[in-house]
């Protein structure tokens, strides 16, 4: 698979990464451990060298899964994980944000153990903590980099001003935020900021939490533990209204003799050479389909047509419930 550099950092990874969250958390019950290990290892065989996890996924179990699966290939892959939530040790529930420097260092030590490694390739602040100056956060990660425990610093769902302030203390290698044909807000301010500063962009939910694959409609029932049950964009009414986006992708995919998911990923890959999407899946055939997107080349005309057609479709429903929306873009 082709490689990409995340901005001006020397972190070079496969053009597509693997978002591992859904193997343990967020989209219904966790997969059986051996199934998760097999899927992650199949990604390695398919050329993926960039794997994304976080302590809060599970919590903790996703890091353990990723660590075990990647142990035989550790020198050939980059592992990204995240800090920034307060997790109740008794219940395992999120209990707000915590990016105090002492806590960041505790999380790093615990994540290193769960990931079975002596260094974290990319350590993201999962959400901006309004109670801790971003300069202190960047300084704490800088210390971890100096100590050889972390290689690169990242931010997630941060606003442009926060990115600038953090980058002035410790160069930010990558920003991870949602970006897809279904959510294009980063184009206004975030992407120009990243381009100016030389920071890579790692879009999560590049397939719109599965919606852009064309396999979800208004009648799809989600498991009771599936995060999409509380997402306004995923109410049955909004799924019905948003079907126009999927139909459009289906039409383009048919013309190109590929799948809607491959169109959505190829579109992202064509946006900038320093964009590395991290689609997730629990299914081997979907992994293979996603990886196939790296061989799709959309012509300038294809991209223009897609641009024109999608710009005429209004997307219905917020991407987060109100409480979670308050945590992004700060």
Give the ranges of each region predicted by the language model.
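N-terminal binding-site loop/beta-alpha segment at the start of enzyme catalytic domains
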Residues: 1-78
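Beta/alpha (TIM)-barrel catalytic core signal, keyed to glycine-rich beta->alpha loops juxtaposed to Asp/Glu
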Residues: 3, 128, 132-308, 313, ...
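N-terminal small/glycine-rich loop or linker at the start of catalytic domains
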Residues: 9-27, 80-95, 119, 124
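Conserved beta-strand positions
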Residues: 18-20, 53, 122-125, 155, ...
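Short, acidic/polar
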Residues: 30-43, 99-114, 159-164
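Alpha-helix N-cap and loop-to-helix initiation/capping positions
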Residues: 31-35, 61, 65, 95-103, ...
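Acidic (Asp/Glu)-rich catalytic clusters
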Residues: 67-78, 113-116, 145, 167-170
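Active-site groove signature of glycoside hydrolases
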Residues: 112-130
């Amino acid at each position: 698979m082709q490689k990409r550099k995340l901005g001006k950092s020397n972190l070079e990874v496969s053009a597509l990464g693997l978002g591992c969250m859904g193997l343990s958390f967020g989209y219904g019950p966790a997969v059986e451990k051996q199934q998760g290990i097999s899927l992650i290892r199949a990604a390695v065989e398919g050329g993926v060298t960039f794997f994304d996890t976080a302590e809060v996924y599970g919590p903790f179990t996703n890091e353990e899964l990723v660590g075990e699966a990647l142990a035989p290939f550790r020198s050939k892959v980059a592992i990204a994980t995240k800090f920034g939530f307060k997790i109740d040790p008794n219940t395992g529930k999120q209990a707000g944000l915590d990016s105090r420097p002492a806590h960041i260092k505790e999380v790093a030590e615990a994540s290193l153990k769960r990931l079975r490694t002596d260094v974290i390739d990319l350590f993201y602040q999962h959400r901006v903590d309004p109670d801790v100056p971003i300069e202190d956060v960047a300084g704490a990660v800088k210390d971890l980099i100096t100590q050889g425990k972390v290689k690169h610093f990242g931010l997630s769902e941060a606003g442009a001003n926060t990115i600038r302030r953090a980058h002035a203390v410790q160069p930010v290698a990558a920003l991870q935020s949602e970006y897809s044909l279904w959510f294009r807000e980063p184009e206004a301010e975030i992407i120009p900021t990243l381009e100016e500063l030389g920071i890579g962009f790692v879009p999560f939910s590049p397939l719109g939490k599965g919606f852009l694959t064309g396999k979800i409609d208004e009648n799809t029932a989600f498991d009771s533990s599936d995060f999409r049950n509380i997402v306004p964009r995923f109410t049955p009414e909004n799924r019905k209204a948003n079907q126009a986006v999927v139909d459009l992708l289906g039409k383009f995919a048919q013309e190109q003799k590929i799948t809607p998911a491959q169109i959505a990923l190829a579109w992202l890959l064509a946006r900038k050479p320093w964009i590395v999407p991290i689609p997730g899946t629990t299914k081997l055939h979907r992994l293979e389909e996603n990886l196939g997107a790296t061989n799709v080349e959309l012509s300038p005309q294809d991209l223009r047509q897609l641009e024109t057609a999608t710009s005429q479709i209004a997307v219905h429903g917020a991407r987060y419930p109100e409480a979670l929306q308050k945590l992004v873009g700060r």
